[in-house]
Design a protein with these regions (language model features):
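Terminal, low-structured helical/coil segments at or just beyond the last alpha-helical repeat
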Residues: 2-19, 138-192
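Conserved structural position within tetratricopeptide repeats
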Residues: 48, 60-64, 94-98, 129-132
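Alpha-helical segment of the N-proximal tetratricopeptide repeat
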Residues: 29-68, 75, 82
Length: 192
């Protein structure tokens, strides 16, 4: 490695390190946080690690501190869904949708819940409402998100699922394949 390249790489590394430290200090100490934000961030980490019970506790702590914390409300609904506490998840999604009726991810996630409950017509309706509000949901996770999840292949989107359900529901009941549990359980909720 020649001297000029070495100096460039060294100073780039130093600059990036300083920028990261500066941002960390700003984000931790100087930026104002709404009540419940710290608990929400802890909950999101637990959720990412598939520790849904611990995530639920942190979401609830965030909501105790700030009952209107919409991100914690949505996170709580997602955690309840993953824990298969479907009735509680439905009540929470209904609350979230009444608080934010124009956000597509809310309908997408409730559609996933309807899908898991076998309420396919309602799932289709929510999937289509989600796509009408936010067409980008049909693109699925970004390549970087898939990389970080170690998910090399693009998973089916809610648009794909809605088309599949419509096609299956058009068949005679004895020919329908609406549920493949090992595939269906891999469907991830949306975060925004």
């Amino acid at each position: 490695m020649d001297e000029a390249l070495y100096k460039f790489l060294k100073w780039t590394a130093i600059a990036l390190g300083c920028a990261w430290v500066g941002w960390s200090i700003y984000d931790s100490f100087m930026r104002e946080h709404a009540p419940g934000d710290f608990e929400y961030k802890r909950a999101e980490q637990f959720f990412a690690d598939d520790e849904y019970q611990r995530a639920l506790k942190e979401y609830e702590d965030a909501l105790d501190e700030n009952p209107q914390h919409i991100y914690a409300m949505r996170g709580k609904a997602r955690a309840l869904l993953q824990m298969r506490r479907f009735d509680e998840a439905m009540a929470q999604y209904d609350k979230v949708i009444s608080a934010q009726p124009d956000l597509g991810v809310n309908y997408a996630n409730r559609g996933i819940l309807f899908d898991r409950l076998g309420r396919y017509e309602q799932a289709i309706a929510d999937y289509e409402k989600a796509l009408a509000l936010d067409p980008e949901l049909d693109e699925g996770p970004h390549w970087l998100t898939r990389f970080l999840r170690n998910q090399p292949e693009k998973p089916p989107t809610i648009g794909d699922r809605a088309k599949y359900l419509r096609a299956e529901l058009a068949k005679p009941p004895e020919q329908r394949v609406l549920r493949v549990p090992e595939i269906d359980e891999k469907q991830r909720t949306y975060k925004q």
